[in-house]
A protein has these predicted regions:
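Catalytic Walker B motif of ABC-type/P-loop ATPase nucleotide-binding domains
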Residues: 95-98
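Conserved ABC ATPase signature
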Residues: 70-74, 78
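Conserved ABC ATPase "signature" region
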Residues: 33, 48-66
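ABC ATPase nucleotide-binding domains
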Residues: 170-181
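H-loop/switch region of ABC-family ATPase nucleotide-binding domains
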Residues: 131-132
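Hydrophobic anchor residue at the start of the ABC signature
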Residues: 84, 112
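H-loop (His-switch) and adjacent beta-strand-loop-beta switch element
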Residues: 143-156
Length: 181
């Protein structure tokens, strides 16, 4: 990683972090357009294909009606969806997200996880995210990675449940994972 240029890295990995500083004067559209920056020329000119891709992503992320709004005028959930749209527009093989469903209502949480699943299936993306929304994440993830007391566990969701790892992970009788489902 030390030897790769920022531009090359930006073509491989897009990220959504929990705390991101960004120019407050940007509109939703301008912030999402920044995701295409690794692919633009020295004048940062976006192609017609870039513009179409951006508009499709704004629609998919339910942001089309907000694209001219300044990011300072957004709710926390709308801003989170804007950062997710920027990562999608960056069009990298790897997407890393830290708590991507933070500030999202239930509708947009479900929509987000379905979008991430669709990107994996249709666009062959590898997506790694951290979350406390285990119920939704377990339903839509192919593989799960858990860390407890410095020990790393990785397997399919079904295998981790069948092995009883989730039951041991929570150390409580109030949370039980159904092995029959």
């Amino acid at each position: 990683i030390d030897t790769i240029t920022h531009q090359s890295f930006s073509k491989e990995v897009s990220m959504v972090l929990t705390h991101t500083e960004v120019n407050k004067d940007l509109t939703v559209l301008e912030l999402v357009q920044l995701g295409r920056q690794p692919y633009t020329n020295w004048m940062d000119v976006l192609s017609a294909e870039d513009q179409d891709f951006i508009q499709d992503t704004l629609r998919i992320c339910d942001l089309q009606d907000l694209q001219k709004r300044k990011i300072t005028q957004l709710s926390d959930g709308q801003l989170q969806r804007t950062f997710i749209a920027r990562a999608v527009v960056q069009d990298t093989p790897f997407i890393f997200l830290d708590e991507p469903s933070t500030h999202l209502d239930l509708f947009h949480k479900v929509h987000l996880y379905k979008l991430l699943k669709e990107l994996c299936v249709t666009k062959n993306k590898s997506i790694l995210f951290s979350t406390h929304d285990l119920d939704l994440a377990l339903q839509l993830s192919d593989d799960v990675m858990l860390i407890k007391e410095g020990v790393f566990y990785h397997n399919t969701t079904a295998n981790l449940i069948n092995e009883g790892l989730f039951d041991r992970f929570f150390d409580t009788d109030s949370i039980i994972f159904d092995r029959d489902r």
